[in-house]
Amino acid sequence: MCEGEKKKDSSSGALYCVNLALRIVVLGLAVAAAALMATASQCTIFLYYGGPLHTITYKDFGPFVYLVVASSIGAFMEAIAIFLTICKKKDGTPAKVLLPLLDAAVPVLLYSATAAAFAAGDMSYCAVGKRVGVCTTAAAGNFCNQVHIAMYVSLAAGVALLVAEIVKHWPDSGKKKEGGGGGCGSDSDSDKSTPCHHGCHSKH
C-alpha cells in the first residue's frame, strides 16, 4: 500500500515538473517569436517597375503587429502563471482564481496570433497603385526569412502549450489538485507522505 502511494506521488510529481518545464518553454518561445517579428524591419524593397524604394517593416502587416502584441502579452501572462504555479499555497484563493483565467487566455492569444500570421504568409503591399509581393522582390530575403522564423517559433510555442495542457490534465496529475504541485522539491511532498506514514506504522 505504501509503495503504491509513493509511486503515485512520484508519478504526479514528474508530471508536475514536465508541465512546469513546458510552461517555461512556452514563455521563452513566445518572447522569441515577438522579438524576431519586432526586429524584422529595415529591409529596403526595390520595385521591379521602377517605383521608389520602400522600407518594409512588420508594422506594414496587421497580423504581424498582432503577433508581436499577442505574444508579448501571452508571455507576460505565462510568466504570472508560472509564478503562481510555483509559489501558490494550498489554500491560495488568488492562484485558484487567476490560474484558470490565465490558462484560458494564453492559448487564445498564441493560437490566434499564429493563425493570423500564417494567413498573411503571402506578404504584399500596395505601392504606386499596384500590389507588390514582398518575398518576390529583391533584397527581401532577410525580412521574409526572419518573419517566417518568427511564425514557426510562435507555432512551436502553441504546440508546447498544447502538450503542457495535456500533461496538466493527465489522469495521474488530476489527483494532485490545486495544492502545490509538489514534485520539484516543494514541501507538499512531506504533506503527502503523512497518510502513508500513518498507514505503515499503524499496525506496529
From Swiss-Prot:
Keyword tags: Cell membrane, Membrane, Transmembrane, Transmembrane helix
Q: Please give the superkingdom of this protein's source.
A: Eukaryota
* Residue intervals on the Cytoplasmic side: 1-19, 85-97, 168-204
Give me the segments passing through the membrane.
20-40, 64-84, 98-118, 147-167
Question: What ranges does the Extracellular topological domain annotation cover?
Answer: 41-63, 119-146
Q: Where is this region: Disordered?
A: 173-204
- What membrane topology is annotated for this entry? Multi-pass membrane protein
Its predominant location is membrane
Name where it's found: Cell membrane
Cellular component annotations (GO), alphabetically ordered: plasma membrane
Question: Whom does it interact with, and what assembly results?
Answer: Homodimer and heterodimers.
Which family is annotated?
Belongs to the Casparian strip membrane proteins (CASP) family.
Q: What is this protein called?
A: CASP-like protein 1U3
Question: Which species expresses this protein natively?
Answer: Oryza sativa subsp. japonica (Rice)
